[in-house]
Amino acid sequence: MVVKKRKLATEAGGSDERPKYLPGKHPKNQEKTPHVDYNAPLNPKSELFLDDWHIPKFNRFISFTLDVLIDKYKDIFKDFIKLPSRKFHPQYYYKIQQPMSINEIKSRDYEYEDGPSNFLLDVELLTKNCQAYNEYDSLIVKNSMQVVMLIEFEVLKAKNLKRNYLINSEVKAKLLHYLNKLVDATEKKINQALLGASSPKNLDDKVKLSEPFMELVDKDELPEYYEIVHSPMALSIVKQNLEIGQYSKIYDFIIDMLLVFQNAHIFNDPSALIYKDATTLTNYFNYLIQKEFFPELQDLNERGEINLEFDKFEFENYLAIGGGGPAAAGALAISALDNDIEPESNREDLIDQADYDFNHFEGLGNGYNRSLLTEDYLLNPNNFKKLIAKPETVQSEVKNERSTTSDIEKTNSLESEHLKIPKYNVIKSMQKEMQSLSEQHTMEYKPYKLIQQIYIFSSKNLYSQATKPLLGSRPSCNQNWVEYIFNGNELSQNENAFSFMLQPMQTFLTLQSHLTSSLKDTETLLTINKEPVKSRTSNVNSNLSQPQQQENDVIGNDTKQDIENLTIGGGNNNDIVGNDNDKRNNITEIFDIRLSEGLNHLMFRCEDKISHETEFMNFWINVLP
């Protein structure tokens, strides 16, 4: 039998290039293994270690998230699912004191006070052990760094679910502003922002640190880059994705930004300049997001200048039972990996996994089997509306929430977060309003020229009835006399709004206007809550053809008293309202007003028919119920 000669790759027309990085373990030749600090995080400045946070049903979230990541990134995770074989790598257990694998992490319980931080330390132990045992410039070490990065990204999304807002046009504009700020940052600007007055002097202020990260690495120049980095990213791509609406939520954008700099950490040696620049830009980006972007976003939202919205599905599940439940854990993982899972099918699976028990749900009253009512707020004062909306999803969770004391403490802590009162920054709001004030509201003194006086007082007929009731009738409870005088020559048109409060049942008033010119030359209008009110003068003019008896009935004795006998200011002739000269010159109008309970808006408008000059007086009258 003739043995055929195997064709070489070059003879078959293939390339003789071999990958630089080979899979598998590459143990170090050193006899002494470097020390591994198991209690120190890789990045102590990360918000995952700085903040005190909690994810409901954390064990279930970990298991679900790791399973999905393994399924998506099999090539990266395959070396870390199980512990190394004692048969093929016996020396591993002599050099590594605390071996760790994904299966070990999934089997542990992290639902206690320091559970989240210990979970992160166990995850980082994957790459710490790998770097201690293998050569640093090996594929397995690079993969271990990416495993830790991907897991921490998912935890970052879940941790910040309550502020992972949807990106609308206003939020997009803010993100673009801070992205451009990072792109234009120099070493001097970054140090001034991070260190303040203690920043070193004589730093470079011309070269932008972001230039090496703007575009993707060229495949022809560094083909081995794509053997290591499984998710390449560049700042220009992030900016383009943000502008075209590729990111639906804020942390989708944030994680891609962090991915740019993490890829530089993975590929380059820690002593390289680009590695240090990536660290600097990461710290500066975290500063911009945590110290400037989110506080500004919250401030704008409290002032009503921006609308912040959540993903309804994941947030409603998060709020169930104070943020607990298997549906919540599944929602967190699904939202983090929604591009790779069919949403509807997985939601059904999560519902099927819930172990409902309708016979052990304790409500108020006389039974365990009735539906929830709004009176059941004692079960959870912040979430009883959620309980009513989704009783089946929640009832199985109440039993689980009562199982341990730690769960109750976590729920109570979540409730206290819901009760947190936002701190409204009134100074910023006032500054913005002052900058946009119109000329109408400036503080320049501008006296009234057309309106000489506005006089508002109680209705005399009703007051007389209240103080002197008829024989056999019940006296009125309202016997207060009120009067308010507004002199135009002492007031400013730029401060034309006045307010006062009346006692209950004080709903009938009379308004008397005193002008500087005849009514023939001016046009007046009084509105109550945007409804026009006719004056007594107009009523009299419309009934001139009626008998004198009817005219007296229309005007009434109160009118005569108001016009002839009403005096102000101790009887000074110059301050008499409605004197005989006013009647002859026809410069006085009287309006009968009926107010409603609550806040009423009166506006008196006067316009000169010749010069078309207009003057206003606004009155806000609050009638107590």
Swiss-Prot record:
**Keyword Nucleus set for record:** yes
Ranges annotated as biased composition (Polar residues): 536-552
Provide the positions where the record notes the PTM Phosphoserine: 199, 545
Domain of life, per UniProt, equals Eukaryota
Range of residues in the leader sequence: none
InterPro entries linked to this entry: Bromodomain, Bromodomain-like_sf, Bromodomain_CS, Rsc/polybromo
Q: Where in the cell is it found?
A: Nucleus
Entry annotated with the keyword Phosphoprotein = yes
- Keywords from the UniProt entry: Bromodomain, Chromatin regulator, Nucleus, Phosphoprotein, Repeat, Transcription, Transcription regulation
Alphabetized PROSITE patterns for the sequence: BROMODOMAIN_1, BROMODOMAIN_2
**GO molecular-function term, one example from the UniProt record:** chromatin binding
Q: Name one GO biological process term.
A: chromatin remodeling
The residue ranges of the Bromo domain are: 53-158, 181-292
Output a single Gene Ontology CC term carried by this record.
chromatin
Record Gene3D superfamilies: Bromodomain-like
Miscellaneous: Present with 8570 molecules/cell in log phase SD medium.
Q: How does it assemble?
A: Component of the two forms of the RSC complex composed of at least either RSC1 or RSC2, and ARP7, ARP9, LDB7, NPL6, RSC3, RSC30, RSC4, RSC58, RSC6, RSC8, RSC9, SFH1, STH1, HTL1 and probably RTT102. The complexes interact with histone and histone variant components of centromeric chromatin.
Q: What does this protein do?
A: Component of the chromatin structure remodeling complex (RSC), which is involved in transcription regulation and nucleosome positioning. RSC is responsible for the transfer of a histone octamer from a nucleosome core particle to naked DNA. The reaction requires ATP and involves an activated RSC-nucleosome intermediate. Remodeling reaction also involves DNA translocation, DNA twist and conformational change.
Output this protein's name: Chromatin structure-remodeling complex subunit RSC4
- Source organism of the structure: Saccharomyces cerevisiae (strain ATCC 204508 / S288c) (Baker's yeast)
